[in-house]
Amino acid sequence: MKKVVHVVGARPNFMKAAPVLRALDRLPIGQSLVHTGQHYDAQMSEVFFRQLGLPEPDYNLAVGSDSHARQTGLAMQKLEPVLAEARPDLVLVYGDVNSTLAASLVCAKLVIPLGHVEAGLRSFDRSMPEEVNRVVTDRLSDLLFTPSADADENLRAEGVKDSCIHRVGNVMIDSLVRLLPGTEERSIWHDYALVTLHRPSNVDDPEVLGRLAGALTEMSRVIPVVFPVHPRTRARLEAVSGVCRAENLCLLPPA
């Protein structure tokens, strides 16, 4: 029986991996799930596993939070013995987080075939850590599963052979369709704005965050604003006076 190992580490990975795991469950394929623990808070990890119907990870590497280099390096260090022992026929990685890059590098060193789900996306901004992760992961991947025609073209422009490119669509839509009926049961305002804010370039600079907080407060005077807050963002917001007290600005846990 062929063996596939899925490596995930953060919220964006979970919602992409869930439909792939379910689809492969219908085939005679052995599957293992490795969670690096890049996102480790219960509201950032466990609740997503429950809501998405993901199985308990076979391995939780408890990498935790650190700088990009340290986090990636520790994930590689902990992934290597797991993949060396498992020797799967394919490792699947998702998106562009540090865990994705770490698994890609380990697979390259161990000569294990690698597939990248959500390959080919580009911002063309190398100041973004995710862009570096995407480009390197795609260069190391044997199978590139793309969400769109522009992703295909990006890979071709970088010299990737057509035989390696497989357009499968946006797998997050599968998760959306599966969870959408449950949203209709929620009691919430009829019209509202949904906000997400977590990029370091937005939340680590007090001046930038202050302007954004002011804009959210102004927006909440026009339409109710629902804001699922990343723990790191919440800590930064606590230093910004007034944003948490706006009447129609609803700060929620990230799940």
Predicted regions and their residues:
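Short, glycine-rich nucleotide/cofactor-binding loops
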Residues: V4-F14, H198-E207
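A nucleotide-sugar donor-handling region in carbohydrate enzymes
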Residues: H39-Q43, A62, L140-E207
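N-terminal beta-loop-helix "entrance" segment that forms/cooperates
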Residues: H39-P55
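Donor-nucleotide binding loops and adjacent catalytic segments primarily
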Residues: Q38, E46, G182-A255
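A short, Lys/Arg-enriched amphipathic alpha-helix followed by its capping loop at the start of a domain
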Residues: V20-I29, A215-V222
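A short beta-strand-loop structural module common to alpha/beta enzyme folds
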Residues: G30-H39
